[in-house]
Amino acid sequence: MAEEEETAALTEKVIRTQRVFINLLDSYSSGNIGKFLSNCVVGASLEEITEEEEEEDENKSAMLEASSTKVKEGTFQIVGTLSKPDSPRPDFAVETYSAISREDLLMRLLECDVIIYNITESSQQMEEAIWAVSALSEEVSHFEKRKLFILLSTVMTWARSKALDPEDSEVPFTEEDYRRRKSHPNFLDHINAEKMVLKFGKKARKFAAYVVAAGLQYGAEGGMLHTFFKMAWLGEIPALPVFGDGTNVIPTIHVLDLAGVIQNVIDHVPKPHYLVAVDESVHTLEDIVKCISKNTGPGKIQKIPRENAYLTKDLTQDCLDHLLVNLRMEALFVKENFNIRWAAQTGFVENINTILKEYKQSRGLMPIKICILGPPAVGKSSIAKELANYYKLHHIQLKDVISEAIAKLEAIVAPNDVGEGEEEVEEEEEEENVEDAQELLDGIKESMEQNAGQLDDQYIIRFMKEKLKSMPCRNQGYILDGFPKTYDQAKDLFNQEDEEEEDDVRGRMFPFDKLIIPEFVCALDASDEFLKERVINLPESIVAGTHYSQDRFLRALSNYRDINIDDETVFNYFDELEIHPIHIDVGKLEDAQNRLAIKQLIKEIGEPRNYGLTDEEKAEEERKAAEERLAREAAEEAEREHQEAVEMAEKIARWEEWNKRLEEVKREERELLEAQSIPLRNYLMTYVMPTLIQGLNECCNVRPEDPVDFLAEYLFKNNPEAQ
């Protein structure tokens, strides 16, 4: 009995552990599918999904990004290839391979229970997929248990299919119609790969092959819609482009729902070998782009000719083909037979908030919201400007917000002709907007007349709140410069608008608007003496016409100190929300340019959360770096040449000095020798030279054959001492 239980346990363990191969794990689609499957228990989709499980799964999917790198027991073990040898191994993968030979790859495939080949992202993978299914089919006789081969293809192999009902073009295609499908001209290789997989997949019991035709994939990092997300998020264009009339219907599916379909194929091993994976939506290109623009962009779209789509450098031919397809499809078998925990069953538009959240989290595009406060002349604006440039944030100053809001209201009130190609606003709504804008302008004018040109807090708070809730600030974030100044201003600005109870009890956490509340509060400060000295040293050109004039500055400084004495300061408000300010005493840093303060704030805030440098900015940075390098090299070369010239001059000077000293030494030696040779000369002239000269003269007169012998004989005979 015990042995049977042990055998059953082992069998269960074998069943519950499956090794899954997926190609190109470092790509968008394969990566998300692999991550999803690595968190799925083998066989889980065979059980019916209850409402409670769906709620739990929603919470689980939100935490998918932070999933543990450790392989969980009973889940699919993911292995696969990488597109680049230097790509990092995904955390969810047990093994990865790159630059591997076909022989070695086949050995790896034979170790797996499920082989998934994704041909939606790289046309180069089709030939390898056909080879893989062919090679595996030849090894069927050696299989110990059944293996599954899943080809992840695209609905573009249906793009030119004839309508099922000529009189009703809205009748969707289903899996049952796969024999009637006609491919887009650019996807003929895809449909050939599908046919090959279906051919091999029906030959053997131990080898089942499936084709899953997926719609345009979205979700997570954005997929093929990422270009539109990026354009909207950056906010650099007034309207998102729609290619053509935008009425073409695009079959779509969330990438995690596609992963759910694959999970069900693995668990259920269905009878149909061709499946369609699309959501229930019937969205047009215009619907999708308009939804993106409204929820994370300028809110407008602009229809442009299809030909202009090819000028968009970030869109590949493959992306354009998917975006311009006009095809209605229904995943009938998937909907009726599979248990899928849908992420976006109703489609892209209905789930845009969740999709946007995934997109921003996956790409690290969370906004950075900063509030910089402090006394006048402490350096708020200069520091805010530097931080805004570094983090690519919107620098918000009160005067600019007010001017912009009033200008916008005046533009609404002024007659506005609707241009050709723009969307017309309904007349009733337009009239209502004009009336509201005119009423608000009248109120602003009256308020400024009654307050000596100053605006009431109610208008300031309204304009500031609208600015902080604008799409650019929601996307990239903001740096709020010198506002709010008081506790009440902060409370009115950041508290929830729909708050029913106004409780003035301090010390409790008020409900605040998470959309606009700052993440970092920077409290700059310095002594009054330091601030006065800084203002005194400012150039007259900067001081003229600003609040830095002596009377206005002293009054502003006094007001700031007065409102920050009691326990109801603006800093207390943030403390109550547990957003503790970063206090920096600028006066103690002794840095006129505030570099140390900026460096300290960057350290506290962290790295930027954006797309980084654009191609143009990278090129500009590279150009500047090249110029700096050339200038540095030129300076180094000039310095080297100068150093060599100096060294050569010093060498010549030393040589000349040495020669001069040598000549001096020689002269001294000559003088010494001359001084030493005087007695010798005197001796020679007295005792030797007279006789020698006579002998030489005599030798010249006689001219003997041997003059030397003659001279010697002469000197011997005429030696004065001998005589």
From Swiss-Prot:
Keyword entries, A-Z: ATP-binding, Cell projection, Cilium, Cilium biogenesis/degradation, Coiled coil, Cytoplasm, Disease variant, Flagellum, Kinase, Nucleotide-binding, Transferase
Record-listed AMP binding positions: 432-455, 482-485, 489, 555
Region (DPY-30): 679-723
Chief localization: cytoplasm
Family matches, as Gene3D superfamilies: cAMP-dependent protein kinase regulatory subunit, dimerization-anchoring domain, NAD(P)-binding Rossmann-like Domain, P-loop containing nucleotide triphosphate hydrolases
Gene source species: Homo sapiens
Function (record text): Nucleoside monophosphate (NMP) kinase that catalyzes the reversible transfer of the terminal phosphate group between nucleoside triphosphates and monophosphates. Has highest activity toward AMP, and weaker activity toward dAMP, CMP and dCMP. Also displays broad nucleoside diphosphate kinase activity. Involved in maintaining ciliary structure and function.
Coiled coil feature spans: 46-458, 609-677
GO molecular function ontology, one term from the record: ATP binding
Region feature LID, mapped onto this chain: 537-547
One GO process term, biological-process aspect: cell projection organization
EC number, as in UniProt: 2.7.4.3, 2.7.4.6
Region (NMP): 397-455
Domain of life: Eukaryota
Lineage, highest ranks first: Eukaryota, Metazoa, Chordata, Craniata, Vertebrata
Protein name per Swiss-Prot or TrEMBL: Adenylate kinase 7
Binding positions (ATP): A377, V378, G379, K380, S381, S382, G587
Similarity comment text for this entry: In the central section; belongs to the adenylate kinase family.
